[in-house]
């Protein structure tokens, strides 16, 4: 019975308005125009949501910290940052000093919203002064991809 309903014209009339693309008044009836919003929808977090503090690890050996950051750069929870940060780390992390590694750790673990990192790295939003470091400048340069390297998957481990 469900199959009959799904393939009936009544179900198509119900679903069509939900999936119909936007048609602009200037376009002809046979031409469909898909639009994207001109502004980023970004709301501040409500004050009643506690943001947990990331635990500092002052006694962590440098190699262990780099291994942890390699893992955390690959497993962000959003594909855009997974690709940007994993390729950035594959290219630069082994050459980072202890201070640069600490800056990168603060950048990816001190920010509570991964979209902020993405917007700062792509220069869609201005970077706050506390995160406008040498590492952020390197990340922005990496994101520009002046070498035109394909980044459609994460680098091998």
From Swiss-Prot:
This protein's UniProt keywords: Chaperone, Mitochondrion, Transit peptide
Main localization of the protein described in the UniProt heading: mitochondrion
Gene3D superfamilies per the UniProt record, alphabetical: Flavinator of succinate dehydrogenase
Subcellular location: Mitochondrion matrix
Transit peptide location: 1-24
Superkingdom: Eukaryota
UniProt-listed GO biological process terms: mitochondrial electron transport, succinate to ubiquinone; mitochondrial respiratory chain complex II assembly; protein-FAD linkage; tricarboxylic acid cycle
Cellular component, GO annotation: mitochondrial matrix; mitochondrion
InterPro entries named among the record's database cross-references: SDH (IPR005631), SDH_sf (IPR036714), SDHAF2 (IPR028882)
Family of this protein: Belongs to the SDHAF2 family.
The protein's assembly and partners: Interacts with the flavoprotein subunit within the SDH catalytic dimer.
Function: Plays an essential role in the assembly of succinate dehydrogenase (SDH), an enzyme complex (also referred to as respiratory complex II) that is a component of both the tricarboxylic acid (TCA) cycle and the mitochondrial electron transport chain, and which couples the oxidation of succinate to fumarate with the reduction of ubiquinone (coenzyme Q) to ubiquinol. Required for flavinylation (covalent attachment of FAD) of the flavoprotein subunit of the SDH catalytic dimer.
The protein's name: Succinate dehydrogenase assembly factor 2-A, mitochondrial
Organism expressing this protein natively: Drosophila pseudoobscura pseudoobscura (Fruit fly)
């Amino acid at each position: 019975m469900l199959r009959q309903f799904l393939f009936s014209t009544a179900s198509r009339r119900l679903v069509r308005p939900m999936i119909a693309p936007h048609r602009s008044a200037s376009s002809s009836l046979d031409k469909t125009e898909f639009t994207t919003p001109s502004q980023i929808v970004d709301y501040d977090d409500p004050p009643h949501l506690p943001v947990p503090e990331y635990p500092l690890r002052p006694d962590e050996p440098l190699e262990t910290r780099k291994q942890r950051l390699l893992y955390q750069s690959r497993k962000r929870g959003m594909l855009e940052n997974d690709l940007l940060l994993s390729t950035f780390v594959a290219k630069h992390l082994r050459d980072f000093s202890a201070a640069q590694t600490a800056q990168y750790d603060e950048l990816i673990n001190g920010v509570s919203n991964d979209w902020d990192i993405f917007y700062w790295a792509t220069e869609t939003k201005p970077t706050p002064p506390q995160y406008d470091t040498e590492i952020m400048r390197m990340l922005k340069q990496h994101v520009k991809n002046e070498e035109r390297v394909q980044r459609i998957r994460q680098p091998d481990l």
